[in-house]
Amino acid sequence: MRTTVSISDELLATAKRRARERGQSLGAVIEDALRRELAAARTGGARPTVPVFDAGTGPRPGIDLTSNTVLSEVLDEGLELNSRK
């Protein structure tokens, strides 16, 4: 399908250079970039890591799970989150 888009001269030159380096057409490079952009938007980027409490022990007493500030401080200080059996 043919369409017309407006892009900066600098971006077009960079895309043409990339196409030459890869031995691809300019259209293929633009299509690949657009596919990656749309796929990234669908997935929402990297998922944050969340602490996992093993064997159902739960968090250590005294850690307020409703406070972002407390959780951030505990994680920044590298303290143990799991309670011990």
Swiss-Prot record:
Keywords: Toxin-antitoxin system. InterPro entries: CopG (IPR002145), Ribbon_hlx_hlx (IPR010985). It comes from the Bacteria. This is Antitoxin VapB25. The lineage of its organism: Bacteria, Bacillati, Actinomycetota, Actinomycetes, Mycobacteriales. One of its GO terms (biological process) is regulation of DNA-templated transcription. The gene is vapB25. Signal peptide: none annotated. Residues 45-65 are annotated as: Disordered. SUPFAM superfamilies: Ribbon-helix-helix. Antitoxin component of a type II toxin-antitoxin (TA) system. Upon expression in M.smegmatis neutralizes the effect of cognate toxin VapC25.
